A protein has these predicted regions:
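Surface-exposed loop/turn elements that mediate protein-protein interactions on large endomembrane-trafficking
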Residues: 19-37, 69-86, 113-137
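An exposed acidic His-Trp-rich patch
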Residues: 75-105
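A contiguous binding-surface segment within folded domains or other stable secondary-structure elements
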Residues: 37, 41-87
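Terminal domain-start segments
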Residues: 1-47, 149-170, 182
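Mixed-charge, glycine-accented linear interaction segment located at domain edges/termini
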Residues: 109-174
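Short beta-strand elements that form the blades of beta-propeller/WD-repeat-like
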Residues: 1-20, 51-63, 70, 95-109, ...
Length: 182
């Protein structure tokens, strides 16, 4: 498992976001076009794992950015894909950590450390039920990587940026009720 450099694996923007279509990018291997085009505007990172390449793309849409994770085989055939995000929410792809032998940890949205667990063999998965909230995939019964994470509720506009801190602090009325019962 290793992070790929931009000279080994990159992307070239083919079309920009429009009102009706997402941006798309062509994959480049060793600086050469492959003809493989995926949804996504910015290649955030790429990882090599057991003759597979895992690519992380964002859409570059302010206030509604999605993270697209693609897994390709050695011939760049798409094995699996997932999208993290939701309407009216945004994220920033940060803190990618390779955790051998088969896990990629990162942050994107909802104050969560997400994990992509790469699978040597495909596994059965129930569509719409097997992934955490905020993760979507095309309808199919098998996957080649699992997404794990427990997204926190989105904070309200003007509220503290730390949803975790807000979630753990009792409200004044709850504290008042507890002291009255004693």
């Amino acid at each position: 498992m290793r992070l790929l450099s931009n000279s080994e694996f990159a992307a070239r923007l083919v079309s920009h976001n429009t009102d009706t279509a997402l941006a798309s990018s062509e994959l480049l291997v060793d600086g050469k076009p492959t003809g493989v085009v995926v949804d996504g505007a910015i290649l955030e990172a790429a990882v090599d794992w057991q003759d597979c390449r895992i690519a992380f793309f964002t859409d570059d849409i302010p206030f509604e950015d999605m993270l697209r994770i693609y897994m390709f085989d050695a011939n760049l055939a798409l094995l699996d894909a997932a999208v993290l995000g939701g309407m009216y929410s945004t994220g920033a792809f940060t803190d990618l950590h390779l955790q051998p032998p088969n896990t990629l940890a990162f942050r994107f949205f909802a104050g969560t450390v997400w994990r992509a667990v790469l699978l040597a063999e495909r596994e059965f998965a129930l569509p719409f039920l097997s992934d955490p909230r905020g993760v979507s995939r095309t309808f199919k019964f098998f996957r080649h990587f699992r997404i794990e994470g427990e997204p926190l509720p989105e904070s309200l506009p003007g509220a503290s940026d730390s949803a975790e801190t807000a979630r753990r602090q009792p409200t004044a009325s709850a504290s008042h009720r507890a002291s009255r019962k004693s």
